[in-house]
Amino acid sequence: METSKPGCGLALDNDKQKPWLGLMIGNSRLHWAYCSGNAPLQTWVTDYNPKSAQLPVLLGKVPLMLASVVPEQTEVWRVYQPKILTLKNLPLVNLYPSFGIDRALAGLGTGLTYGFPCLVVDGGTALTITGFDQDKKLVGGAILPGLGLQLATLGDRLAALPKLEMDQLTELPDRWALDTPSAIFSGVVYGVLGALQSYLQDWQKLFPGAAMVITGGDGKILHGFLKEHSPNLSVAWDDNLIFLGMAAIHHGDRPIC
């Protein structure tokens, strides 16, 4: 990640690059990307009320593509006249009305980058598992509380338990814990890994050899834990799937790779 202000120093005059901004409004944070053509060049995350230094210098000067799972936050950014994506904009089949636009974009980005059929695991505030077949048809999926949400909920709702933070979780915990914080980490992490292993193995039976990719804020640590916990599962990690999905819409659903 560059330390300069997002969007600084990137060429605007090359017609092939055509810069644009992507904004994914998630359940707890704003996810930004500075894109040139169909490639995310810089990505960063802010809270819902970002400081001016965190905003891209090109905001309002180049096209802004926006997707959101928080309607009231969408209204904040209408002043920049964004192209607001909905499920109707995506070339995917069998989506139900309440299906999350973030899941759909990640699925599209996964399929066009790694090939359909594909399974995408998004490790965010909510952890989602979503599968599409070779015809870009939604097979189905699941939603569970993410790692951070589980840790926070145990600390908030149970007086005898400490509230633990994700930054304390730096390595795969011991399964058989001998203190309360370690027991919480063990239960949360191995519970999530067990669920993921079950879904991924079932997906392999349904679609042998199909792509399986992890993304999201907790995606990198989940990917590392899963490799250690279930080394026989072939799962990629890609932090840009949602923005690759946006790029596909921006460029008319052309293959990314």
From Swiss-Prot:
InterPro entries for this protein: ATPase_NBD, Type_III_PanK
Cofactor comment text: A monovalent cation. Ammonium or potassium.
Positions with a binding annotation for ATP: M24, I25, G26, N27, S28, R29, L30, H31, T125
Give the record's GO CC terms. Answer: cytoplasm
Q: What is its EC number?
A: 2.7.1.33
Q: Which reaction does it catalyse?
A: (R)-pantothenate + ATP = (R)-4'-phosphopantothenate + ADP + H(+)
Q: Which cofactor does it need?
A: NH4(+); K(+)
Q: Name one GO biological process term.
A: coenzyme A biosynthetic process
Which Pfam family, any one, appears in the UniProt record?
Pan_kinase
Q: What is its pathway?
A: Cofactor biosynthesis; coenzyme A biosynthesis; CoA from (R)-pantothenate: step 1/5
Amino acids binding K(+): D122
Q: Which residues bind substrate?
A: Y96, G100, I101, D102, R103, T180
Class of enzymatic activity (EC top level): transferase
Q: Which UniProt keywords apply?
A: ATP-binding, Coenzyme A biosynthesis, Cytoplasm, Kinase, Metal-binding, Nucleotide-binding, Potassium, Transferase
User: What CDD domains does the record point to?
Assistant: ASKHA_NBD_PanK-III
**Where does this protein chiefly localize?**
cytoplasm
Q: Does the keyword ATP-binding apply?
A: yes
Q: Where are the transmembrane segments?
A: none
Q: Name one GO molecular function term.
A: ATP binding
Active site residues according to the UniProt entry:
D102
Signal peptide segment:
none
Role, per record = Catalyzes the phosphorylation of pantothenate (Pan), the first step in CoA biosynthesis.
Subunit structure, as described in the record: Homodimer.
The UniProt family comment states: Belongs to the type III pantothenate kinase family.
Name of protein = Type III pantothenate kinase
Q: Which organism is it from?
A: Synechocystis sp. (strain ATCC 27184 / PCC 6803 / Kazusa)
